């Protein structure tokens, strides 16, 4: 993967003509395509394989092909690509040869956000859930925001919406610096930690990129920073120097919007929020985990800065049931509950397992972890292993390569060897097809199984449930 280039001024969305997406099934790409379709633009695209996203976009009028062929770009005016597309893709090359406008995904996102009051949610962890919560809170306030999110909201079942209100909420991707193409009025930064080091090269470069992101916020704008994370707190001086209004949120005693009296349970959480010494009132969530309470506090902090009524935000957040692949329940078989989570960074993994511990309510937590990317596994194997120590039983799968080529010596075994549990509680299982039977053999009634990772581990939930049903009583 490489960094996106600043392509300069991008035409307004209604001047892009027919837009062709290479990799249209991706979370970010499909959301933008959905909004363009809602605005009446002709959209086409391709992807490597069929998916639920492709089916949904076809139903909205998109012309979508499976596979990559230069002929697919015929008739297009603008081609959209992303960092997930390998250099030399035949459709991208054909578009360049034909002199078509070729734009990175984030440039088109910036184009569709133009004219709205843009709000960007950035951070190493928690972006998708926080963006989703913010969209729901704005809806509860009667604002009907547009939004583009890296995951499907459970209620509408989609990752994007072309609203009639003034706000446009977007998940801002730091992995390839594409968030530096956005120009929001306001932003939330959940946390800042080293990640995507295959791209950035160093932790300092990651922090520098987030400081540069502050420079993209409109003059006189607002930034809301996570108070519990050193990386995001460290952005406050730079934000103030830019003249931005700065608010913080979290559990920290000095947070501008502070969580007080947090009570966690299998059913979610209950707490009060305090802002400037004033108690705003109670807030309850049905999504589990301390991290989700913190995410909600960030949403409220930004909402207050925008002048939104707390009571309406609290009502919306109380009804928020989550986003797809964010601690998503997959089912139950023989007394064993199965959940799925997208966590692919040590901090996200720790948060997911902490939530699992509360939801398990005394039962054992069985973690099924698939490392994502060879580079990330190499960089964080020890941290992943340490985080997995919060489970009772651990099954580590082999690395999901995604866009990367294999790296000698880098396998899931590196993670398994770093888990601080007895050897009998940790298993390295490189065969994807063997995992369901392995998990069914380990789990017992009352256990909670959590499949974890950004790869195809998400497809294991139904397989594990079937294996549990088929297991001898």
Located regions from the model:
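Beta-strand->loop->alpha-helix junctions that form or flank phosphate-binding loops
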Residues: 46-47, 65-68, 103-110, 148-151, ...
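N-terminal leader/targeting and accessory segments in enzymes
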Residues: 1-108, 230, 255, 280, ...
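C-terminal helical cap/extension that packs against the catalytic core
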Residues: 385-445
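Short glycine-dipeptide loop
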Residues: 218-223, 361-362, 390, 445-446
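P-loop/Walker A phosphate-binding loop and immediately adjacent motor/lid segment at beta-alpha junctions
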Residues: 91-100, 205, 216-221, 242-244, ...
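Phosphate-binding loop of NTP-binding sites
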Residues: 35-38, 58, 72, 83-227, ...
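Nucleotide phosphate-binding/pyrophosphate-handling subdomain across enzymes
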Residues: 3-20, 28, 34-39, 180, ...
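Short internal beta-strands
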Residues: 41-48, 222-227, 366-370, 390-401
